[in-house]
Amino acid sequence: YGRGHFCNKLKRSILLLFLLGMFPYAWGQQTNVSLNLRNVPIKSVLSQIEKSTNYYVFFYTDNLNSELSKRVNVTVNNTPVVTVLNQIFSTTNISYEIKNKRQVSLFLVEKSSPKSKAQAVKSNKIQITGTVFDANNEPLIGASVRVLGTTIGSMADINGAFKLEVSPGDVLEASYIGYNPQQVKVGSQTRFQFVLEEVANTLDDIVVVGYSSQKKETVTGSISMVTTKDLLQSPQANISNALGGRIPGLLSVQRSGEPGQDMSTLRIRGVGTFASDAESQNPLIMVDGIEVNNLNDIDPNEVESLSILKDASATAVYGVRGANGVILITTKRGELGKPKISFSTNVAITNFPFLPEPMNSYEYARAYNEAQAYDYYSQLSYIPRYSEEAIEAYRTGSDPLFYPDINWYDYMLKDFSTQTQTNFNVSGGTERVKYFVSLGVFTQNGMLDTGIYDPGYSYQIAFRRYNMRSNFDINVTKNLLLSLDISNQMGNLQNPNWSTGQIMESLNSTPSNAAPGVIDNKVVTITDVFGSGRNPASPYTRGWKSKYENNLNLSGRFTYKMDYLLKGLSLRGALSYKSYSTETKTYNDRGITYDLRRAGDELIFVPSTDPGKLTYQGTNSRNIRIYSEIGAEYTGKFGEHTVTGLVLYNQGKYYNPTLKYNIPNGYQGLVGRVTYNYGNRYLAEVNVGYNGTENFAPGKRFGWFPAYSLGWVLTEEPYFPRNEVLSFLKIRGSYGTVGNDKIGGDRFLYLPSVYTYTGSNSYYFGEVGSSYVGYVGSNESKAGNPDLTWEKAIKWNVGADVKFWGDRIGLTFDYFMEHRDNILCNRNTVPTIIGISASNLPAYNMGRMRNSGWDGEISVGDRIGDWSYFVKANFTYAHNKILEQDEVIRNEDYLYRTGLRYGQFFGYVADGIFNSWEEVNAAGRPEYVMANNNNKIQPG
C-alpha cells in the first residue's frame, strides 16, 4: 500500500510540474481557430472555441452573465485564439487569462475599476488553507482554486493542498478537468475541503470496437454498449438473461427456467440465413479479444463493459466469424492507487409465476363419466367408469389411500427456491504493476420438493458455478506493456435421471386420483381400483446424474510503443490457450415402486421389481483452442486531422476428439482498418477482413470482406445554430460484406465423405437364380462439391445520434438491411433417377434471404442536487424473408415456404371447438379463420 500510494503521488506531482512548466500564452498564440458567426452572444463564441480547440472556459455566471449576453460578429480564418478573444472582449468589461491547455484554458474575470482596487487594499485579508480530493479520497493534483470575480487563485499540490489569501464574503471555486466544479462562500473559517465528482458526459464514453476502442462521439458503426452497473441491476443467473431488453438490436429468448439450463438464445438483429444449425446463426463472442463459446460462464461482477457490434462496418474485421454480429466483453482491470476491496452478495427468490389449477378427484371422476357418456362411439353401451360410491369417496376423502385426492403440483413442487451470487474482488496497482483479482460463487436450487421421498441420495436439481479471474498489467519498460490474464470457471449441474421436461409432463398428465403419493418412504401406485398405475414421484427412484464442467483460459498480450521510430506507432500481439473439459456421472437406480393392495384390514405393498444396487456410467470429453495474433497500430494527429490504422494477422486451432477425421480445425485471417477524423466533425472508416477456410477447394478458400462507413457531426459545424435544445447531432452510414463458410458440423465440403465398409451384402454379381452372389464392400456416403464458395451477405446501415437539452435526453436510431446470397445449404429435392438420397448430395450455394428492420434507444437522465435519475427504453424490429430456396414441389402455391419468414408457423388458425351437438351437426367440420378476409380459407 505504501509503495503504491507513493507512486500515485509521484505520478501526479510529475503532472503538476508539467502543468506549471508550460508556456500557456505561447500555446494560445499557436492554437488557431476559424469562425463565421453573425450577431451571436459572446457566450456562443466561447462555446465554438471550446468545440474547435482543447480549451475549457470557466466563469462565474452571476457576475458576467450580462456581459456574455452582448452580441458580436466574428469572421476569422485560421486565426490565433488570443486574437479572437481580444476582439470579442474589446467592448466589454471582461478580461481574461490563459492558464494552461490541459486543465483550465481560459479564466474570465470582471475588469477591476480603481474604486474596487482601493476597496481591496482596505479590506481585511485572511490566510486560508484546504484540500481538493475526488470521491475516492485521492488528491486532485493541479486542481484550480480561485476567487470568483478576481484573478486570485492557486493550484493544489501533490497532496491536493492549497493556500490562498482571501477576504470574508469571497466565493471560492475548485475545479479540475473532467470533474464538476464546486463553490463555497468564505466566512470566518480558514480551512476548506473540496470533494469533486466526475462529470457524467456520455459523449466522452469509450466504446470498445473490434481490436480497439473509440470515443462514442466518433463511432461511425452501429454499436451499443452496457456496463457492469447495467448487468448487476437485477440478480440474473447469467449474462445472456441480464442482456434481455437492455440493448437495441439484441433479441433474447429464454426457453427454460431449469437451474443451469436457463440461459437465453441471443440473436443480433434477428436471423439472416435459413441454415438451421445454431452455429450459422449465433453471434461471435469475444472476451478481452479472445473467442469463447459461452458467455454465461462469466461472473457479471468481472465485466467492465459489453459492446454489441451490429453492422458490417463494426464486424468486418472479424471476417467470417462476425457474420451474425459480435458481442465484445471487456473484463475489469486494475487502476493506479491503493488496493480497493469489494464484497457483494445477493439472494433471489424464484418461483413459478403460473401453474395450472387441476381438477380434484371428485371433479375429475364426474367429468370423466360425462365425457365418456358424450363419446359417440361408446354411448350405446356405456357403463360409467366411476360408480356413485367411488365418487362419494373422492368427495368425502374417507379412504385417501385407495381413493386419493392429490394436487401433484403442490405435492411435488416447492413454493419457492433460492439463488445466490457472491463475489469478492480486489484491484489496485503501482506505476509498474496493476492488478484485478476476483472470486465468485453462484448457486441455484431447483423447485422439486425432495422432502417427500428419501432414496439415500440427493436428486434435487441444483447448479453451482465457481469463478476465478486475475488480470495483471505490467509495465516492463517505458515502451512495453504486458498483460497476463487467467480465468477459470467450474460448474456442477445435478438433476434426476428423468429430465425436467419428463417430470413436468407427468405432473400435467396425471389425474388427482392416480396414486396416494409416497407412504412410509415408498412410492406407491394403485391398480386394482381406479388408479392408473402411475405416480409422478416415480422419477425420484431412478437415480441421479451430475455434470462437471471446467473452463480454463490463459492469455497474454503485449503492446510495444515505437514512438522513437514514428510517433503513434505501436506493435501488439496476443496468445491464448483455452481448455474446456466435461465429465458426466450417471447413477442408475432400479426405480422400485410399490403397488398398494388391501387384504382385509391389512395393507400390502407389492414391489414392482427386486431391489438392486446403483449402477454407474461415466463419460468425459475435452477440447482445446489456441489463438494467436500479431499486428501494428498507428495513431497520428495533424492539427485537426486524426488518422488511425491497424494491420493484424491472426490464426487459431481447435482440437476436439469428436471432430470429423480427428483433424484439428484451423483458422487464418488478416485484419485491416483505417479511420479518419477531421475536427470531430467529418468521420470516415474502412475495415477489411481477409479469411481462409478448410471447407472450400484450393482457389476458393480465401475471401475479402470489406466495409465502409461515414459520419458527420453537424453540431461541430461553425455555421450550425447553437441552442439549448439540440446539443449534439450525428448522422452515419455504413456498407459492407460479410461471409459464412459453415453448414452444420460438416467439414471439407469440397471432398466426398470417407468411404465406409458396408458390413453386409451390398454388391451382387452373377445371374439371378443361379450364380447370383452378394459381396460386402465399401460405399461412398456424402459427395463433395469442388465448386462450393463463400456465402455472402451485403449489409446496409444508416443511423443518427441526437442529444437534447445538454445531453439530458438522448436518441439513437438505426435502419438496417441485409441481403444474403449463395447461402450454404443441402438440397431438399433430388430426381429419383440419380439413385441416391438427398442426404448424400453435396452442399450447394443455392438460396437467398433478406433481413431488414430498425432499432433504437431513448434515454432521459439528469442530476438535481444530490439526486439523479436515469430512464432508458429501446426498441427493435427485424423482419426476414426467404427469397429463394430448394423446396419440394407443392400441389398448391400457397403451400410454399419461399416468400415467407424463416421459422414461420404454418397451418390453419383454429377458431375454437364445438360446444354443443347443434354446432357439431350444423358444421360437420372444424372451424377456421379467414385470415385474409377474402372468403378463402388459407394457412397463415
Predicted features by range, described:
Residues 157-160, 313, 358-365, 372-373, ...:
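A short, hydrophobic/aromatic-rich structural module that often spans a beta strand
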Residues 370-372, 382-400, 516-529, 534, ...:
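A subset of solvent-exposed loop/turn segments in beta-rich extracellular surface proteins, enriched
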Residues 106, 266-268, 329, 632, ...:
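Short beta-strand element of the conserved SAM-dependent methyltransferase core
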Residues 342-398, 498-499, 747-748, 757-758, ...:
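Conserved small-residue
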Residues 231, 282, 288, 416, ...:
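Extracellular/periplasmic, surface-exposed regions of secreted and cell-surface proteins
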Residues 134, 147, 157, 519-520, ...:
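Acidic surface patches and DE-rich sequence motifs
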Residues 1-468, 482, 839, 867-869, ...:
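Short, small/polar-rich motifs associated with maturation and membrane association
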